[in-house]
């Protein structure tokens, strides 16, 4: 028998916690025998004193086990269960293409996704731009869809890692969100509850990332990879660039439109294509569906060019309650903003840098994200035709097209876009799309 306050004291004094102490505390979080104040106190002691790998694994598994864990063995799927998780960014629509692409290559993707958080877009918010599509499925429906279609994307239910919800709510109001052990456990508790054989992490780097610096992102990636593998799930991470909007668009319906056009080969932003292909290739290799990157890319191109990936996306939408002909007629179903106009720069020159976080907050301010939990979202608003780093822009070349609900909203967004994009006389050096591949925790 343990006492929550003694566990807090032990960590406060810099001592490691045992697996049993961690599990006792997390069980108390779940059954409400641990108070919000005690959660806050332990979170702050972890923030200052960190956790070793064994503690991080124990915390993650305890949070996972606070709820239901999916077990795919009885489904006889005939292929590996694999998923991807991104630490979040702006215009990061990869999940909508990646899931169907992996399904078309023989994998099974049970993706539990989230809503937008701060400046970052949320996969669930994007999917809700599709009329009729259900984002909360019961276990039986989720299992059935993964088995039949190969991919399902839904929101976190009350049965999946419920302790995480209570801990995160406390972290959010106690300045402990950016603790690597707590971030790691929060991400992986939900992912491991999916019953995965393998996981690929997309850890963003740059002005629109959770961890803006390469060193911070690398530390987070190493922590996640170390804990996930320690918990029995084969995991690697890619560090990918978020110093500019990843897709050509940012905003819910606008990104869904771009995802469909990507899958049907109508339009593919080169950087979005490269990140998606890199993540998918890693998923196929770690899941045993491809023996090399070349083989993986060949299979993925075939899935796209044959139309199989687009067909899987269409089936996913239809099974989850969306229109059966959505892929063919998406422009008839997606909401359209009242006003769409280009934004031109105040001067001219090469785009030297972007405050990608500010561009994400511009979409939120337009109504495309939530500033309070109860806020409604305008799925139609956002940015399209985003200029890229290194582009030369002038009075005839727009920085972006702003989709807004009113002239006033458009004007505010236009000023925010101009302020977020810095021009110079010389084109900047091109940034890599993928910085690094992380396969093990730091020594």
From Swiss-Prot:
Pathway assignment: Pyrimidine metabolism; dTMP biosynthesis via salvage pathway; dTMP from thymine: step 1/2
Origin species: Sodalis glossinidius (strain morsitans)
One annotated Gene Ontology cellular component of this protein: cytosol
This protein's name: Thymidine phosphorylase
Record bears the keyword Glycosyltransferase: yes
Record-linked HAMAP family: Thymid_phosp (MF_01628)
InterPro entries: Glycosyl_Trfase_fam3, Glycosyl_Trfase_fam3_N_dom, Glycosyl_Trfase_fam3_N_dom_sf, Nuc_phospho_transferase, PYNP-like_C_sf, PYNP_C, Pyrmidine_PPas_bac/euk, Pyrmidine_PPase_CS
Entries under SUPFAM superfamilies matching the protein: Nucleoside phosphorylase/phosphoribosyltransferase catalytic domain (SSF52418), Nucleoside phosphorylase/phosphoribosyltransferase N-terminal domain (SSF47648), Pyrimidine nucleoside phosphorylase C-terminal domain (SSF54680)
Protein family: Belongs to the thymidine/pyrimidine-nucleoside phosphorylase family.
Key words, A-Z: Glycosyltransferase, Transferase
GO MF terms held by the record: 1,4-alpha-oligoglucan phosphorylase activity; thymidine phosphorylase activity
């Amino acid at each position: 028998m343990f006492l929550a306050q003694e566990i807090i004291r032990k960590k406060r004094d810099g001592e490691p916690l045992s697996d049993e102490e961690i599990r006792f505390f997390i069980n108390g979080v779940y059954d409400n025998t641990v108070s919000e104040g005690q959660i806050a106190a332990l979170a702050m002691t972890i923030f200052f004193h960190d956790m070793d790998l064994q503690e991080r694994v124990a915390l993650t598994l305890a949070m996972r086990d606070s709820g239901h864990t999916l077990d795919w063995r009885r489904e006889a799927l005939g292929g590996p269960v694999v998923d991807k998780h991104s630490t979040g960014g702006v215009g990061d629509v990869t999940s909508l293409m990646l899931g169907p692409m992996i399904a078309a290559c023989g994998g099974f993707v049970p993706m539990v996704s989230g809503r937008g958080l701060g400046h970052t877009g949320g996969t669930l918010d994007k999917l809700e731009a599709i009329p009729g599509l259900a984002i909360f499925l019961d276990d039986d429906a989720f299992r059935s869809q993964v088995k039949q279609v190969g991919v399902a994307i839904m929101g976190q239910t009350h049965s999946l890692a419920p302790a995480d919800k209570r801990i995160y709510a406390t972290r959010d109001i106690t300045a402990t969100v950016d603790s690597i052990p707590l971030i790691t456990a929060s991400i992986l508790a939900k992912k491991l509850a999916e019953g995965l054989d393998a996981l690929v992490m997309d850890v963003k780097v740059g002005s629109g990332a959770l961890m803006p610096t390469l060193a911070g992102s690398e530390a987070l990636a190493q922590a996640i990879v170390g804990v996930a593998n320690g918990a029995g799930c084969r995991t690697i991470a890619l560090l990918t660039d978020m110093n500019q909007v990843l897709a050509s668009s940012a905003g819910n319906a606008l990104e869904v439109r771009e995802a469909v056009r990507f899958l049907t080969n109508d339009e593919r932003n080169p950087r979005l294509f490269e990140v998606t292909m890199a993540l998918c290739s890693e998923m196929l290799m770690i899941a045993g569906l491809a023996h090399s990157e070349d083989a993986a890319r060949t299979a993925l191109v075939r899935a796209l060019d044959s139309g199989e990936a687009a067909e899987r996306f269409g089936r996913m939408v239809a099974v989850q309650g969306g229109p059966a002909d959505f892929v063919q007629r998406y422009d008839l179903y997606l909401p359209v903003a009242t006003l769409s106009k280009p934004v031109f720069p105040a001067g001219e020159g090469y785009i030297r840098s972007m405050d990608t976080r500010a561009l994400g907050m511009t979409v939120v301010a337009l109504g495309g994200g939530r500033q309070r939990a109860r806020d409604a979202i305008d799925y139609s608003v956002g940015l399209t035709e985003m200029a890229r780093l290194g582009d030369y822009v002038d009075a005839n070349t727009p920085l972006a097209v702003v989709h807004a609900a009113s002239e006033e909203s458009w004007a505010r967004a236009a000023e925010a876009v101009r302020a977020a994009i810095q021009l110079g006389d010389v084109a900047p050096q091109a940034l890599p799309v993928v910085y690094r591949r992380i396969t093990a925790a730091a020594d």
